[in-house]
Amino acid sequence: MNRVRMARAGFVAVLWSVLLCLAGGCASTAMAPADSPATVDAVTLNLWHDKQDWPRRQDAIVADLRARGPDVILLQEVLQDAALPNQAQVLASRLGYQYRFFSADAPTQARRYGNAILVRGTIEASREVKLAPLDDYRNAGWVRTTVDGRPLNVYVTHLHHTPEGGAIRAEQIAGVLTLIGETAGDAPSIIGGDFNARSDMPDLAPLRARFAEAYSDAHPGVDANAPVHATLNPHLGHAPVRIDHVFAQRDAFRVVDADIILDQPDATGAWPSDHYGVWVRLMHSDVPRR
């Protein structure tokens, strides 16, 4: 008799579990799993288009990115031409990522130059805008993706390059922020690229008001703009300045770590690019600190 009662009790418990699941909604595949790390790894890199030995540089870049496996990759100075397959497409194919290429050049042109976003998951939506002034041929791109069950907006840009062009960069930042306002919705956002300016410059102040610059946040108490932290490659004739950044929405993420990557030559002395890359790890701010 006790065994019968125990069996009935077990059946009732299972039945209640099923009914509660149906009524309250079981965890769906669209929700983040309970053990989800709730982190986002991102890399930004200026590719230096097809300068020097692109096939050799490509191999070095692929090897590094494959080992890291970032969730998103932001590329600048991406080139395609009649004899050159789109560099972002090639990298995405080799890494198994989806990509979007953004260019101010007409789609009918054989030679197109611009930026790209690669994602390890699925690209759910995308958009691009040209940035003023139009004769500067700059743009910003956006994709919506999902990382560990959480929606994410990803933006890429490459701003005006002259040292005296702060006002132009400020105008371009305004264009980027307009794009964010029109596309972000309720999902958190990150933006990265080659800003051609230190992150503490007045040109970028409107962006800093809403977005934390990840590398500086990951290295508190040090001068993150010192030459040792540069992203321009001094071995290829550049002044050592850090102008490549990833910004994370302040009320959505906290910075876990950040590093300069792709900053070593291969055995033949070839460098991956004339810029170093930046890798960052972000954690959603609703995840408790450990």
Label the model's feature ranges.
Residues 40-47, 61-84, 118, 143, ...:
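Active-site beta-strand/loop signature of hydrolases that rely on acidic residues for catalysis
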Residues 87-93, 111, 171-175, 182, ...:
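Preference for well-ordered, secondary-structure-rich cores of eukaryotic proteins
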Residues 30, 181-190, 197-290:
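Metal-dependent phosphoester-hydrolase catalytic domains
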